[in-house]
Amino acid sequence: MPNPLRKIFRIEVVCVAALIALLIFAGSLFIQRSRSSAEAQTLQERHARLRAAMDRNDQSEAESLLRGMITNDPDAFARNNYDYLLARLLQNRRAGAEAGTFFLRVVNRNSPLAGYALWHLAEIARDRGAYPEEQKLLGKFVSQSGDHLLRDRAIERLADSYFKTGHYHYAIDTLQLLPRSRRVALAKIGEAQLAMRRTEEARRTFEAALANGSLDDASLRACAGLDRIDAATGTVLTEAEALRRASVYQFNRSFTEARRHYLILLNNFPQSRKRAEAMFQIGRGYFLDNDFVEAAKWYDRVHDEYPRTEEGEQGFYYVGHCHQSLGDWMRAIARYEAFLKEYPNSDYFGYAHLNAIDTLRSARRFEDALAWAARAQSNGNNPFTVVNGLFQEAKIRMTQGDYAEALARFTALRSRNLNVRGLTATTNAPEVAFMRAYCLEQLGRFDEAIDEYLALPELREGAAGYYGHRASERLRDLGGDSYAGVLVATRRDAFITQARAARAQGAVEAMKSAANQALRFATGATIRDEMLRILRDAYSRLPGYQLPKISIPEVGRTAPIESAATPPSDDSHQTIAGELLFLGLYDEGAPELLQTPIAKSDYAISLPCARGGCASRTVKFSEPLLRSLPEDYRPELLPLEVAEIFYPFPYRDSLARHAAPRGVDPRFALSIARQETRYNPREKSVSAARGLMQFIASTANQIAAQLGLRDFEQDDLYNPDTAILFGSQYMKNLFAEFGSSQAVAASYNGSEDSVRRWIARAGDNDVDRLVIEIAKRETKDYVFKVINFYNAYQAIYPST
């Protein structure tokens, strides 16, 4: 008799099998429908999604879309050079082998982008240390490149590769392809000749590189080469030659080599008229190398031997700085006191008072510092000294916790002329107004403090712009106080009500004023959006708030090439620019565009350059337009394309790759770069700082060691990606020590030691106490500018 349980089991198995079959069928149907949906998307639609991902720098999404496009339409993928874009994205994430396969496809079909593909294949080979392969690829590029934009760079890179493998004759032949005007190439030819022991040829080549009297990188290489030759041959330098080489080394901060040549002048030419200069520069070199003991010796010597010269006067003064830097407070004070007696009419008279007071403050001798401050205030014949004395006393009182006396001094400063020569080294009107509010806040006089903070409007530039934004930040902080928060909320709500009422009445100026003030407080997103709408409405009705007319034409093609069309095959700059910009590769497309007739139009190239590697051109064009706008025009209300021109965001890939992983906000790094060089990657300053992020040699060498870069050369800093890597690492170090953006900006410009000294002098980590302690005019102005840029970038690009 059959088992009923077995029958039931068979029925269940059949049912389960049927259910599985149904699920498989449904799944296949879903897949087919999904595939059909993807195929139904037009090439134009897929390209639009791809460009949107590229424009927001979502490289992961862009790569995913590109891989889907390979499957959907491989012919269109090649026809539109999407394989080149995919290769670039793969190279960015260090997938060099796979990137190479796609670059090779571009080369093999002789695409207009074949030259760029060869360049990147050579980069991949170089990263692997495969120099023979790199040389083969670059040699092919140079032989086929014609007037390619990368041709000279390829020649330089090929010569460098030959240097690394010891093929100096090939390096010379390669460098000779460059114009004679490229003096760095000339100096490198001399180095290759010297390596081949063609000494006299090398000497003539180095002399030719030095002939125009410049102090630049080419001259530095030439001097180093000549010194190697002279050391081997025992050549004795003339006075003029010793001074020439010393000047080149000193400018480039090669202080050891500079000192050696200054000593030749001092030891061999006792009657030289340049002896005072040589002594002073030796002292300066030691000082900038932080060897303050040796610096003081040389500064004293130049004063002792040449007291009535400019070098003697400055040397006597700078000895005080040496003692101050060594923490030898009493000797520093004695030197400043002696300087005031010996040089009562010196341009440094007021600064000697300032430094004497600062030294006493560092020594925590506050009563003596107050006595010096009073002495400075009594010098009615020198307005700078009087104002400096008042400002110093205010800072001392704050350090002592006596905010009432500090408030009195800041109040006295309000009635003073703060525009006397040199006063930007100490303080300014917005700073004085802000510090009055700060003191009122510390005294618990919140009502008055809030009013004074509100009296400092949010502006874009200068000390006024910086302190307006700092006032808003203090207001938001006060909103969290149990007592002051009630007062803050009352003011905020009043401004919101006023803005709404003014809009209802059509009172445009009142709308603008009230909405601007309301936005300074912490509000919810709904209220903030409402106030911005009111402000936008006010701008539209105020003649002074109309944006300058910026017509941004389309450049490059915008539509993908369909199957029936023939892709472009020529390698003109116009075609290459069009293909690169079509792919969203502004870093290469914008410089190509500058080689076309359209480059004559600042309007046409402003947006591509803002996104690419020529943002310095955009800034040069846009800064006058930005200055034509009212100072209180809020950056976040600019249309995005206009905002990008006023505040470009170039080098997104490098910033995302190097800054963000190190905990550095890319927008802050960008603000530093803007202030340092206006985004010019080839910049070299009078302080011999190189590249986009302006590194001097000593700091660059320290960062290279941290990063484990063994083959680093100073010229590498002219590569924007390398500069951003170094800048990001350096800023990471600074943030780890100092914390605040203001302190990091001050360190970047004025040195870590200076910031440590200013923080110690303030006796407080409060950022507002630090900023008023910044004693260097250039550094304080630098902080204002960087933070103002940072505020604008945060407003325009709320996420990175």
Locate predicted features.
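Acidic/histidine metal-binding catalytic segments
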Residues: V664-S671, F738-A745
